[in-house]
From Swiss-Prot:
InterPro entries: ComplexI_49kDa-like, NADH_Q_OxRdtase_suD, Ni-dep_hyd_lsu, NiFe-Hase_large. To E.coli formate hydrogenlyase hydrogenase isozyme 3 and to bovine mitochondrial NADH-ubiquinone oxidoreductase. The keyword Metal-binding applies. One of its GO terms (molecular function) is oxidoreductase activity, acting on NAD(P)H. It holds the Pfam family NiFeSe_Hases. Its cofactor is Ni(2+). It comes from Rhodospirillum rubrum. The lineage of its organism: Bacteria, Pseudomonadati, Pseudomonadota, Alphaproteobacteria, Rhodospirillales. Keywords: Metal-binding, Nickel, Oxidoreductase. SUPFAM superfamilies: HydB/Nqo4-like. Ni(2+) binds at C64, C67, C355, C358. The carbon monoxide dehydrogenase (CODH) oxidizes carbon monoxide coupled, via CooF, to the reduction of a hydrogen cation by a hydrogenase (probably CooH). Signal peptide: none annotated. This is Carbon monoxide-induced hydrogenase.
Length: 361
């Protein structure tokens, strides 16, 4: 067998963020993949130890734009565990609304990029146009289109009055039928999508367990793990929703899981807007921070996000560390790419929705 090596990245038109792949190929088939990280390392975990507990909310929001609610929420949960603060019920519902709003926008961005990679740019623009409904909603409700700045220690920074609820529901009423009746059927049946994604980048459920995969990548292979179900936080244990699961473990299944989850997220937001009780949106003043340790986890758009926080009795953490889904998922690219065509590499990489800024932190 005569093989040769193709370098892809760190700057490449098919990559959303800098990654370097050293890909060994035999003809048009991929034999092995070596991934090199470190191109956007920013030392954020170290920076967190030089900032106080309030400044770190802003810092964690900037770990990743698409997960900019998950990071500060998980950080706040860890800090609340150490201080013993109890988040008011209304604030818990508002946290879920912010969480699911970001999930819809994140998933839509990923599947839009899929359409762009296969050359279906009219579909890409259609998805991005529909995504603007959520972007406009974020700007109107939270004041920002990307880093929505919704989280506070012991609660949230925003609230929804009747007009705000009505506006939110109106936006969902515009988005949901567009996804359900116009966009998702194209991903399910259009040959431009189906022929390029079915049977590509296959992962078995056993592979998911072996590699510790999570998020839509694992659920696309039928591996039923979702923090919102297995270890519910906020008010997810009071909400009615089904976990989205795929059957084939390929690029297409992962895209379909993201579409199903987008619709599920819309349903969760509706439930929260309907059931949210009256009351405060934040607990009382933050008490003095005792020395202690805590671990918190949430279901970010890409999968399980874990934060470890160690405090020493001051207002600055002694250690703040997070483990993101991409860190676990990208090793499985070796399995997904083995035997794949060179032209399928961008599709396979995009299917794990890699967030390099999260991972290299």
């Amino acid at each position: 067998m005569s093989t040769y090596t193709i370098p892809v990245g760190p700057l490449h038109v098919a990559l959303e963020e800098p990654m370097y792949f050293r890909i060994e190929v035999d003809g048009e088939k991929v034999v092995s993949v070596d991934i090199t990280a470190g191109h956007v390392h920013r030392g954020i975990e170290y920076l967190a130890t030089k900032r106080n507990i309030y400044q770190n909310i802003v810092l964690t929001e900037r770990v990743c734009s698409l997960c900019s609610n998950s990071h500060p929420q998980t950080y706040c949960m860890a800090l609340e565990s150490i201080t013993g603060m109890v988040v008011p019920p209304r604030a818990q519902y508002l946290r879920v609304i912010a969480d699911e709003t970001k999930r819809v926008a994140s998933h839509m961005f990923n599947v839009a990029i899929l359409a762009h990679i296969v050359g279906f740019d009219s579909l890409f623009m259609h998805v991005m146009e529909a995504r603007e409904i959520m972007q406009d909603t974020k700007e109107a409700v939270f004041g920002n289109r990307m880093d929505i700045a919704a989280m506070a220690i012991g609660g949230v920074k925003y609230d929804l009055d009747k007009d705000g609820r009505d506006y939110f529901i109106g936006q969902l009423d515009k988005l949901e039928p567009t996804l359900r009746d116009e966009i998702i059927p194209l991903y399910q049946t259009n040959p431009s999508i189906v022929d390029r994604t079915r049977g590509i980048g296959v992962l078995s459920a056993a592979d998911c367990v072996d590699y510790g995969l999570m998020g839509p990548v694992a659920r696309g292979s039928g591996h039923a793990y979702d923090v919102r179900k297995q270890a519910p936080y906020a008010v997810y244990d009071r909400l009615d929703f089904e976990m989205a699961l795929g059957e084939h473990g390929d690029v297409w299944s992962r895209a379909m899981v993201r579409w199903q989850e987008a619709l599920t997220s819309i349903g969760l937001i509706r439930q929260c807007l309907r059931d949210m009780p009256d009351g405060p949106t934040k607990a009382g003043p933050v008490p003095p921070i005792p020395a202690g340790e805590a671990v918190a986890k949430t279901e970010a758009p890409r999968g399980e996000l874990i934060y470890y926080l160690k405090t020493n009795g001051t207002d600055r953490p002694e250690r703040l560390k997070w483990r993101v889904p991409t860190y676990m998922n990208w090793d499985a690219l070796n399995v997904m790419m083995a035997g794949a065509r060179i032209s399928d590499i961008p599709l396979i990489v995009n299917s794990i929705d890699p967030c390099i800024s999260c991972t290299e932190r």
